[in-house]
UniProtKB/Swiss-Prot annotation:
Residue ranges that the Swiss-Prot or TrEMBL entry lists as coiled coil: 424-488
Chief subcellular location: nucleus
Protein name: SWI/SNF complex subunit SWI3A
Keywords: Activator, Chromatin regulator, Coiled coil, Developmental protein, DNA-binding, Nucleus, Transcription, Transcription regulation
Subunit-level organization: Homodimers and heterodimers. Interacts with SWI3B, SWI3C, BSH, and the C-terminus of FCA, but not with BRM or SWI3D.
Domain spans labelled SWIRM: 13-110
Species whose genome carries this gene: Arabidopsis thaliana
Region annotation (Disordered) ranges: 291-325
Tissues expressed in: Expressed in roots, stems, leaves and flowers, but not in siliques.
Amino acid sequence: MEATDPSAEIELYTIPAQSSWFLWDDIHEIERREFAEFFTESSITRTPKVYKEYRDFIINKFREDTCRRLTFTSVRKFLVGDVNLLQKVFLFLEKWGLINFSSSLKKNDHLLSVDNAKIEQGTPAGIRVTATPNSLRPITAPPLVEERVETGIKVPPLTSYSDVFSDLKKPDHVLVCAHCGERCDSPFYQHNKGIVNICEKCFKNGNYGENNTADDFKLIGNSAAAVWTEEEILLLLESVLKHGDDWELISQSVSTKSRLDCISKLIELPFGEFLMGSASGRLNPSILTEDENTEQVQTDGQEHEETETREEKEDRVNEDEPPAKRKRVALISEGDSSLMKQVAAMASKVGPSVATAAAKAALAALCDEASCPKEIFDTDDYSNFTVDRANGEKDTDMEEQQEEKDGPQGLPVALRIRASVATALGAAAAQAKILADQEEREMEQLAATVIEQQLKKLQSKLKFLDDLESIMDEEEKVIEGVKETIIQERVSVLQCAFRSGITKRWDHTYVK
């Protein structure tokens, strides 16, 4: 037998019959019509040579292992260029059966029984064979099937379960980034026309593709909830402690999340409620807790000093404790706040002068109901007044007992409460009067401003009229001067005529 020349041998490549127009060394008219952008010579990156390199590489990549299905992701890793054009070329070759035609099996083909499997020898009748020139691989005849196999798919001996059935576990529709080729598991950006999807990372890096801008894409939430990183969570907690419940400032601090995302994430955190309570306590230091209010309403000087010392110690302890262990501060408007706490809070919100005026108004109001309301806040005067009033009715011993009983602690509680309530109401009324006076002053100031502007407008009009009058006077003077000049010229003309001997009669005839 004669030795065969390896260079003369060619490689067989099986393609469908409908793709018989395909040639390795040429570009068919169908390809030119489908990819007109490669043949217009509008760009150096879109030429017939570039298209042929794309096509040949994709087909050769599939020929490396025709038993597996070629994906666009595996091709995209080795090619550089416009992702849209690469995907278009890939889909075109797959449509005409130039790739993936022998692996386009249904998902349940591996479950077929032996009776349903059909094995043929040689090339089927509907397949045409074309040759690839300059190939170093010799022609090999298809192996004969000696014995029937159990399944319709032949796999290598060391193939694992995940390699065979990994495609079945994948979802039917996987979103892939058109630029980097990775899956879009997180929220991604979709083109307004719905032709391109890019991941969030590529969008932030500015990889929009050719002839695309950031305005051409819209954010699509692919996952049920946005993914929070540790840095974003720490920034959220810091913003909540700093700004309280001002979600606008919090969302500005956490620039990657919206207000709704920040609220939802804080609700999900196990210590979010305590954190909000701690933030409210820091932002409203004038609002006191129940124990502090109870101690603050004590009127005795010594007990008041002890209360302040105790409160300062508690504040230092609370500052050292973590935010989650702080007690939430009750608001004034809450229903469980006592009357004395509300009175103390209302009185603390006004100035000393307003509080003094309110106290005087409260005493004046109480004078109409009680005979000695003013002496309640002055123990010495109240005791002396009681002694003078009781003179003649009780003896000296009874007067001494009365003096011992009367004092700061001997005053009726109901009268104290009424005095405190009247003081708070008077403070509120005084504050309202101050606000009303302030509004009235502002109205007077605005009215004065309007009057001043009207006066300025009137002055400008008067000035304009004065200027106009001066201009008219100047024009009148000019006209008078012109009149005098004309009269003088006429007189001179008549004098010249008389000197030349023109008679009066001739003059009249000439004139007629």
